[in-house]
Regions:
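Interaction-mediating elements
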Residues: 1-122
Length: 122
C-alpha cells in the first residue's frame, strides 16, 4: 500500500465504526483504475460471531453486512473519501465471508485512481 491507499484504508475503518458501531480490525486498499479495492479482516462483533454459529445466523449476517452497508453509503455519502481522493464516489460493491470474517468492498469513483496516484509497480 502506498500513502494514499493507507489513508483511504483509515477512512474506511473510521467510516464503518461511525456508521456501523464497529469497524474492521484491518483494511488493505489497492487502487486499480477507478476502483478502490478494500480487503477487510476482523469485521464481526462478538455477538455477530455467536450468531454465525447457525446457518440462519450466517445468512442474516451476510445480508446485513452487504445490503445494509450499501444502504449506509447511499444515505451517508463518503465525503471524506471523496475529499482525500479528489474524486466523486459513484457506487459500492460489497461481499463478506462470514466463516473467515473477511470482507471485500470495491468503491467506484469517477476518476482513474491508479493513474492519479501511481500505484502500479509494473
Amino acid at each position: 500500500m502506498n500513502r494514499m491507499e493507507a489513508e483511504f484504508s483509515n477512512l474506511v475503518k473510521a467510516y464503518r465504526k461511525r456508521h456501523m458501531g464497529k469497524g474492521p480490525e484491518r483494511v488493505t486498499t489497492t487502487f486499480c483504475k477507478s476502483w478502490a479495492i478494500c480487503e477487510m479482516a476482523g469485521n464481526l462483533s462478538p455477538v455477530e460471531k455467536f450468531m454465525a454459529k447457525t446457518g440462519d445466523g450466517r445468512q442474516m449476517l451476510r445480508t446485513a453486512r452487504t445490503e445494509m452497508v450499501k444502504e449506509i453509503y447511499k444515505d451517508h455519502p463518503p465525503v471524506e473519501m471523496e475529499a482525500l481522493l479528489g474524486a466523486k464516489f459513484i457506487q459500492l460493491f460489497v461481499d463478506i465471508d462470514i466463516a473467515q470474517d473477511v470482507g471485500m468492498s470495491v468503491f467506484v469513483f469517477d476518476e482513474d485512481l491508479e493513474k492519479k496516484f501511481g500505484t502500479r509497480n509494473g
